[in-house]
Every structure is written in C-alpha cells, then in structure tokens.
C-alpha cells in the first residue's frame, strides 16, 4: 500500500545556525518536513546539506535555533535518544558479524527482548529482499547488497525519520539506478520520512516527493521535482539542475498580460512571462535541450528563427544530441531530439545550417541578474 504524505510536520528546523570557528555554514535556516515525505536536500559541495542532516541526527550541535521532531524539541537531545537513523555512504557494517547480527545490533543495544529480535530482523531483511543472506558476512556481499543491509539495519529500529547521506554514490551507474527505484519503493512501503542528501541532480529528480536546492547555506528553491526542473526560480537552480540553454533577450514591448515581445539572440518573437518589464530591459530565456527545435535550412534560405550551424552530433539510441553554434555570437546551444529513423531530417550533417526555435510557452523567462538598468 502506498503511503500518503501527511501535512503534519515531522521535523521543523527553526532559525537554525551552525558555525565552525568563524565559518558560518547555515544561519537563520528554516525548514518544515512533512510526515511520510521523501525529501532530498540537493546542492554542490560545501553548500551545507550534510551539516543540516548531521544537525537533525544529533551528530552536530547547533549554535542557535531549534530542532523540533514530532512535536518535541530535540535540539539538546543526544543522537542516541533521537528517533532517527542514518545510512552513511560507507555503509559502516561490522565485518566480523553476520548479516543477521549486523541488523540485530541496534535492537540489542536497545535491550529489545531476544524473542522479538529474530522476527524483526527477518522482516527487515525480507523488505530488502536479502532474507537468505542472513548467515553471510558483509565481505561476501556485493556493494548493492551491502547497501540494502545498511538500510535494513537502519529501519529495523522503526525510526520516525531515516537520514541518507550520499548513500548511493559508491555504487556503479547501473546498480545506483536500480537502488534508486528500490529505495523509493521501500519508503512507500514503510511510510516513514526519508531525508536524502545528494549532489546528483538526476538522483534527486528520480526519487523525491520534494527537493530543496541549497547554495551557501540558503534555500534557493523548494518544490516538487517537476517544479524544480521545469520552473527554476533563478539562474543558479536552472544551471545546477540538468542541462539548460540560456538565451540573452531584450524587451521591446509588452503585448498583453502574458506575452512580451523581445529580441532573443537576434530573433524577434513573443515570450511568455508575467514579470514586470520595461522597454530595453534585459532578460534570460531558458530552454532545456529537449525543448529546442531545429529546422534544416539552405545556405541562403531566409528564416525568422535563430540561425546557427551544427558543430557536433551524437547518437544516443533514443535521442540525437546536437551542438549548434549560433551565427551571430558563436554561443553553443544543446539540442536533444527523439531519434526517428523514418524522418530524413533528424540526422543532421556537421556544418548544416539550421534554424533554432521552440514551442511557445515552453520557455522559462527570468530577470538578467547582471542587468543594472
């Protein structure tokens, strides 16, 4: 049965502050996490994402603010008394213990009666599909299996929150993709809150109910994977989440409440935005590679599109990825088209002259952060 994200918060971080000597990592940091949610904290190295996780876990002491967990202030509560468990990148399994004993370790530390331990351990192993491995040692398991055991050990205590710190980054690409699906399915089955920290954008988009993007300790955007990808709130988020083309534009006039006429890289066209704009104002028009369209042109053919030439083309199975160099300023544009072998125009030749366009409303329009006009 799929869990339903509940609106009741399981965690509230209120005006949280953490510094190391003179170096402030987060300051006045506020975040509410709902019960049953799969939340990913995403950001580049040094943005503060692991610090936030460690503060929730109790591995770091806050310099200010509050951590509320299921209605209780746990700011000063030691890690071992908080109803959270953490899965680390290194897995941290005990090599001299069997898989069963690794998973049972936390229960024994909590002095759970022996008659309860075996069924709970076997249930946890069953959840990660490794019940038959109970008598093996960690060294006899693959990386993916060790990852699952680390998760089983974390969930056997029935924590209210599971914290995962870059937990899949040590796996190879194929296994990581498999574990992403398994982890999300397990979270649904358990119905507990998962907080996942990663710098991998694709991983965040694949697994999360909600993503927060961090930069220098600040939340740049908080939203669903689709919102983060399709409606980035600023240029940092747009550039950090996947490939994106950023076109320079200048406002000519507002057409109506939804459309603005602008010069976009030499092409006069209407763009959709509700930003308050004035004539001459600089904007950025953002388009994902899959949202850009190409039309092959003869060398002297007239077109209202942005003109460029194919400089690189790569067949990727389902898609053809092309790099277009714009004629007027040599800017490179990435284009991803679904490959159709029956379409004679899909496989472009190098140096082919092309027109670059897009479907109206697919663009994202942001203010030019360097425009001081």
UniProtKB/Swiss-Prot annotation:
Catalytic reaction(s) noted: ATP + H2O + polyamine-[polyamine-binding protein]Side 1 = ADP + phosphate + polyamineSide 2 + [polyamine-binding protein]Side 1
| Keyword Membrane attributed | yes
Q: Which positions does UniProt annotate for ATP binding?
A: 43-50
Which EC class is this protein assigned? translocase
One MF term in the entry's GO annotations: ABC-type putrescine transporter activity
May I have one GO cellular component term?
A: ATP-binding cassette (ABC) transporter complex
Give the main location: membrane
Does the keyword section mention Cell membrane? Answer: yes
Q: Which InterPro entries match?
A: AAA+_ATPase, ABC_SmlMolc_Importer, ABC_transporter-like_ATP-bd, ABC_transporter-like_CS, Mo/tungstate-bd_C_term_dom, P-loop_NTPase, PotA-like, PotA_ATP-bd
**Keywords, sorted A to Z:** ATP-binding, Cell inner membrane, Cell membrane, Membrane, Nucleotide-binding, Translocase, Transport
- Reading the lineage from the top rank, the first entry is Bacteria
Instruction: Provide the E.C. number(s) assigned to this enzyme.
Output: 7.6.2.11
Q: Gene3D superfamilies in the record, alphabetically?
A: 2.40.50.100, P-loop containing nucleotide triphosphate hydrolases
Topology with respect to the bilayer: Peripheral membrane protein
By its UniProt entry, which PROSITE patterns does this protein fall under?
Answer: ABC_TRANSPORTER_1, ABC_TRANSPORTER_2, POTA
The protein's location, in the record's own words, is: Cell inner membrane
SMART domains linked: AAA (SM00382)
Sequence ranges assigned to domain ABC transporter in this UniProt record:
11-241
Record function comment: Part of the ABC transporter complex PotABCD involved in spermidine/putrescine import. Responsible for energy coupling to the transport system.
Record PANTHER family: SPERMIDINE/PUTRESCINE IMPORT ATP-BINDING PROTEIN POTA, SPERMIDINE_PUTRESCINE IMPORT ATP-BINDING PROTEIN POTA
Protein family membership: Belongs to the ABC transporter superfamily. Spermidine/putrescine importer (TC 3.A.1.11.1) family.
State whether it acts alone or in a complex, and with which partners, per the record.
Answer: The complex is composed of two ATP-binding proteins (PotA), two transmembrane proteins (PotB and PotC) and a solute-binding protein (PotD).
**Protein name listed in UniProt:** Spermidine/putrescine import ATP-binding protein PotA
| Organism field | Mannheimia succiniciproducens (strain KCTC 0769BP / MBEL55E)
The gene from which this protein is expressed is: potA
């Amino acid at each position: 049965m799929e869990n339903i994200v509940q609106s009741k918060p399981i965690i509230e971080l209120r005006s949280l502050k953490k510094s190391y000597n003179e170096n402030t990592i987060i300051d006045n940091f506020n975040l509410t996490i709902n019960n049953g949610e799969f939340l990913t904290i995403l950001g580049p190295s040094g943005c503060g994402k692991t610090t936030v996780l460690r503060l929730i876990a109790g591995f770091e002491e806050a310099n200010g603010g509050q951590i509320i967990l299921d209605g209780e202030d746990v700011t000063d509560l030691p890690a071992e008394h908080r109803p959270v468990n953490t899965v680390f990148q290194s897995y941290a399994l005990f090599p001299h213990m069997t898989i069963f004993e690794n998973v049972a370790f936390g229960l024994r530390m909590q002095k759970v009666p022996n008659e309860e331990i075996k069924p709970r351990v076997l249930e946890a192993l069953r959840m990660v599909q490794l019940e038959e491995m109970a008598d093996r040692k960690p060294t006899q398991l693959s990386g993916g299996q060790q990852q699952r055991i680390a998760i089983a050990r974390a969930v056997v205590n029935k924590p209210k929150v599971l914290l995962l710190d870059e937990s899949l980054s040590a796996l190879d690409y194929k296994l990581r993709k498999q574990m992403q699906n398994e982890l999300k399915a397990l979270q649904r089955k358990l119905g507990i809150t998962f907080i996942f920290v990663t710098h991998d954008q694709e991983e965040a988009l694949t697994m999360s109910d909600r993503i927060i993007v961090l930069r220098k300790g600040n939340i740049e955007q908080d939203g669903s994977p689709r919102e983060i990808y399709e409606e980035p709130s600023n240029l940092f988020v747009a550039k950090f989440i996947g490939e994106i083309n950023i076109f320079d534009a200048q406002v000519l006039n507002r057409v109506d409440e939804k459309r603005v006429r602008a010069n976009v890289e030499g092409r006069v066209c209407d763009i959709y935005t509700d930003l308050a704009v004035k004539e001459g104002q600089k904007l950025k028009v953002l388009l994902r590679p899959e949202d850009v369209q190409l039309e092959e042109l003869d060398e002297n053919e007239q077109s209202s599109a942005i003109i460029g030439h194919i400089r690189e083309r790569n067949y990727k199975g389902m898609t053809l990825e092309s790099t277009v160099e714009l004629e007027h300023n040599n800017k490179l544009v990435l284009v991803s088209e679904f490959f159709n072998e029956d379409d004679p125009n899909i496989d472009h030749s190098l140096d082919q002259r092309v027109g670059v366009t897009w479907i109206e409303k697919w663009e994202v329009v942001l203010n030019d952060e360097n425009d001081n006009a």
